[in-house]
Amino acid sequence: MVILVGGTNGLMALKVAKISGLPLCYSHVDRYPDGEKYFRFASNIDGEDVVIFNSMHPNPDEIIFETLLIAETAYSNGARSVTCVFPYFAYARSLDTVKGEALPIKTVVKVLKAAGVKKIITVDFHLQENVFGVEHVDLTGMEKLAEYCLEEFSDSFTVLAPDEKAAFWAEKFAAKANCDVVALRKIRIDAENVIIDDLRTGVEGDVVIVDDIVSTGGTVCQAARIAKRAGARRVFVACTHAILARDAMMRILESGIEDIVSTDTILSPVSHVSVADVIASALS
C-alpha cells in the first residue's frame, strides 16, 4: 500500500504516512497554459494498493476531478486497487431536494465508482450513512476534540448540539468527556440564515457547542446567544471541519464565544487537534 498526496492538506497526508509507516507515492502535477491539468506518477505503482489522500476544501470541484484523474491513471499503470481518503467530504449537505434541484452527492458517487474507487474513508461524514455503494469507513474526531476541550477550555461543561443532526456528534463527544448533552432545534431559512429555538431548560457553568461543520458561523453564533440567555458562564465551540467561510471567524468572536477548536481535516487557524493517527489506524 502506498499513499499519494493530492492537491489539498498534504501536511496531514505526510503525518499519516509517518505514523502508519506507509511509503509515499510521488507524482508530478502541473497545469497547461490553457488551464488543463497534467498528472503523472513518478513512482512505480504496478501491483500496489494506492491510497489517494485529498480533502474537499477549498475548491471541491477541482479536487473531485483531480481524484478521478489520479484513480484512472493508477489503474492504467497497474495499480491493484484505489482507496480514497477524504478527511472532509463536500456535497454532503442533504439527500433531500425539491423539484428541479441538483443532488450533487449522487453525481459525485457515480463518478468515483466509475473511476474504480473501491473504498472511501471519511471523518465525521455529514450524511451519517453510506451513500457510496462501495466500502465506506467513517471515522470520528469527536473523542480527540473532547480531550482537547477538557485540557484547554474547561474541566467541566455541558455539551450543546445546535440542532438535531448535530446531536449525533455531540453524543460521541459527551461520551468521551463524561458530561450532559442538550440539543436545540434548528430551521434553516437559506444557505446562511437559520432560526433556532430557545433552550427549554437553563444551563449552568461552561458550555461547548459541538457540530461537525462550521461554515458561515451562523448556527453556532445563534446557539451561543441562546446558551448565554439560558445562564451559560462561558461558551466554546468544537467542530471537526472548520470551513470558516468569509467573515465567519469575526462573527464567531463577536458573538461572545470564548474560543473555537477544530481538527486538521481542513487546515485553518483553529486546527489544533490532529486526526492523522485516527486515519493511520484505519489504513493499517
UniProtKB/Swiss-Prot annotation:
Active-site residue list: 186
Binding annotation for Mg(2+) 1: 126
Top EC class of this enzyme: transferase
Compartmental location: Cytoplasm
Entry GO terms, CC: cytoplasm; ribose phosphate diphosphokinase complex
GO MF annotation list: ATP binding; kinase activity; magnesium ion binding; ribose phosphate diphosphokinase activity
E.C. code: 2.7.6.1
Recorded metabolic or biological pathway in which this protein acts: Metabolic intermediate biosynthesis; 5-phospho-alpha-D-ribose 1-diphosphate biosynthesis; 5-phospho-alpha-D-ribose 1-diphosphate from D-ribose 5-phosphate (route I): step 1/1
CDD domains: PRTases_typeI
Residues reported to bind ATP: 34-36
Cofactor note: Binds 2 Mg(2+) ions per subunit.
UniProt keywords, alphabetically: ATP-binding, Cytoplasm, Kinase, Magnesium, Metal-binding, Nucleotide biosynthesis, Nucleotide-binding, Transferase
Positions contributing to Mg(2+) 2 binding: 163
Entry binding sites for D-ribose 5-phosphate: 188, 211, 215-219
HAMAP family tied to this protein: RibP_PPkinase_A
Function description: Involved in the biosynthesis of the central metabolite phospho-alpha-D-ribosyl-1-pyrophosphate (PRPP) via the transfer of pyrophosphoryl group from ATP to 1-hydroxyl of ribose-5-phosphate (Rib-5-P).
Protein family according to the UniProt entry: Belongs to the ribose-phosphate pyrophosphokinase family. Class III (archaeal) subfamily.
Name recorded for this polypeptide: Ribose-phosphate pyrophosphokinase 1
Organism: Archaeoglobus fulgidus (strain ATCC 49558 / DSM 4304 / JCM 9628 / NBRC 100126 / VC-16)
